[in-house]
């Protein structure tokens, strides 16, 4: 019971921190230069002129919200703020990159993916390969098609 409550409070705090970060980015308000992920996330998003809390939508089965995103050809930059203690995975950001490509259909030829996860006092930076993102895009298309067919069969 205590663990459930603790997890709930941590999730609630994470939601509040994401909302604060989005507001600070939208208002272009930088925060203290400290090696704290929250501050680095906000300052970097402002410096790169990123849009906070951007919905990426391909279908009713495939969507997500990027914490901060900007596309300036040929670079798609996605940053994610993690407020919990679980080990971060770049896979979520690669899915967001795939959703972006499916929704906005940029020229994939020279596209670069600059992905960052901000957690605790560190930043994990990753540069994904186009083949990895295209593979995820194909999975999303296939699963969406399958779920659409299953949904029609259930009507």
What is each residue range found by the language model?
Residues 138-146:
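Internal, Lys/Arg-enriched amphipathic helical interaction segments that engage polyanionic partners
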Residues 1-65:
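Metal-dependent nuclease catalytic cores that hydrolyze phosphodiester bonds in DNA/RNA
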Residues 56-138:
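Nucleic-acid nuclease catalytic cores
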Residues 25, 29, 104-105, 148:
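Secondary-structure transition/hinge residues
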Residues 145-155:
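Accessory terminal regions of nucleic-acid processing enzymes
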Residues 2-4, 31, 36, 85, ...:
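Extended aliphatic helical segments
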């Amino acid at each position: 019971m205590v663990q459930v409550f603790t997890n709930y409070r941590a999730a609630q705090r994470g939601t509040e921190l994401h909302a604060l970060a989005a507001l600070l980015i939208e208002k272009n308000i930088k925060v203290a230069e400290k090696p704290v992920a929250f501050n680095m996330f906000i300052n970097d998003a402002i410096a790169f002129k990123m849009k906070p809390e951007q919905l990426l939508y391909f279908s009713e089965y495939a969507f997500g919200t990027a914490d901060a995103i900007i596309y300036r050809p040929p670079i798609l930059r996605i940053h994610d703020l993690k407020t919990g203690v679980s080990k971060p995975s770049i896979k979520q950001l690669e899915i967001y990159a795939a959703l972006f490509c499916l929704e906005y259909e940029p020229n994939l030829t020279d596209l670069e993916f600059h992905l960052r996860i901000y957690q605790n006092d560190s930043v994990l930076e990753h540069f994904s390969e186009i083949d990895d993102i295209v593979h995820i895009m194909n999975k999303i298309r296939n699963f969406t098609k399958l779920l659409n067919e299953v949904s029609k069969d259930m009507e």
